[in-house]
């Protein structure tokens, strides 16, 4: 049956029995396709019936359906004609793991950063009203913790103040809400959604209040009783107090019930919340039995067992986790904070070992940063572990609440640089540019596991301001020993005997391995290269300027955007000291990169050892620092 679904219109003629069969097919399809590519499995298994109902009730794309977060949108993609593309999920030139307007007119927003869809919905509803499109509904599906983000409640406050047709579907796949009791609550919820209910209610208010002497008193008594019953029976007070209509909770795996609720909500033609309770990982035993996160996201797995088909080597995240636990065992002032991601950021083990010193604040990076500031004021040393891409949300708090007060808060940025398969919104290529403008901020970029352990310890010894440590996703690789340490800078390679000091190659973090490979290529062409790892990359260590005076060209190599990164900082530091040595940078272009593997993205922008060696050769030749173009070109090719 799934093969016959080319678009939402094909769902309209299906019977309830056929919809149930289709739901089973969709789950089987998801399990086998995501098992082969990796992706967000658990959340999508939980929204099958909900997504079917959404596309039967609303007219997408005429009625925008916005997913928050977008990793819940796999079934939506399937029902809008993209089943055939799932073999390429999260691969180069393939299907995105999030909604993508480049893929389909049914995808309005990319929505991989949580808690934003309601603000989009508010804006779209206003735009439709101003354009005279009064028959268009905007649907926001908010779930997987997105409602723990403050931006959602800012948007709800604005949506509630209008009469615009915004339908807010709360996909509750956790245990945040208690179940509603009995049929009376269901009756109240259904009644409140009837379009004529408000008219009748208003007439009743006027009639009771019009009774001489006791009318207002009677109305207030009746209203108080109604509110008390409502709050006792339904977990809706947080919405109704804002002025939003509410229905639910609805069994999210009963397609007929969900569809009925959505049709009532649509007919109301004003802001309404539909509370749908779903089970993450529904229908797949390995996910349902995963107590940690119901297989929220997985790599390539065996679809029968749910087990990974290969075991990765030691990763950056696990190395950080082990190091933090070791240090916390020696110091009771070390506390850890995460924004709803204890597993992905490596803090689950810390939570288990030190539960009283671990704080999961939900999807609330802004609160996380200022709460960390308060902890630091109280004598603790907080470690805030988040993905690099989510640092953007906490910039004001980091600048004004942490740095302004010179507080010892350590921010650990996982998934820095190019992450790859999750696409543009998850690449952590902005952090150095952001951190570089924060007064008093010190930033480390470890090149290997040994340096991560070392620099984490150094960060936790800082007591007069904030620190940050950034590292990428994936395996940590082999340790890269230094020849010597000059000041705070590790020297990894020097020109061979008899060669001149032509190029100072400044490698940021894990790009140290690439820098050494580039130096080998250049040595074969007679170009002498010194490779250094600054370790603490911002502010630029003094030793970099000293080393620069001995070379003819300085080149920085980093996986940050070219504007505002280490390259810009090194160039600025040399200008400040009036050191007249040319600087060049090999960095990421300042643009958004589509999903692909990390290696594919780096290759597409020329950040490979061969291409960088060719670039440096050209720069050296242009400066007249070494051999002629023709001889160099022959060696490069």
Curated annotation (Swiss-Prot):
Enzyme type, top EC level: transferase
Record pathway: Metabolic intermediate biosynthesis; 1-deoxy-D-xylulose 5-phosphate biosynthesis; 1-deoxy-D-xylulose 5-phosphate from D-glyceraldehyde 3-phosphate and pyruvate: step 1/1
Note on cofactor: Binds 1 Mg(2+) ion per subunit.
Cofactor: Mg(2+); thiamine diphosphate
Record keywords, A-Z: Isoprene biosynthesis, Magnesium, Metal-binding, Thiamine biosynthesis, Thiamine pyrophosphate, Transferase
SMART domains, A to Z: Transket_pyr
Catalysed reaction, written as an equation: D-glyceraldehyde 3-phosphate + pyruvate + H(+) = 1-deoxy-D-xylulose 5-phosphate + CO2
Residues binding Mg(2+): 144, 173
Binding site for thiamine diphosphate: 71, 112-114, 145-146, 173, 284, 365
GO molecular function terms noted in the UniProt entry: 1-deoxy-D-xylulose-5-phosphate synthase activity; magnesium ion binding; thiamine pyrophosphate binding
Quaternary structure and partners: Homodimer.
NCBIfam families linked to this entry: dxs, PRK05444.2-2
Name the record gives this protein: 1-deoxy-D-xylulose-5-phosphate synthase
The organism of origin for this protein: Mycolicibacterium vanbaalenii (strain DSM 7251 / JCM 13017 / BCRC 16820 / KCTC 9966 / NRRL B-24157 / PYR-1)
Name of the gene: dxs
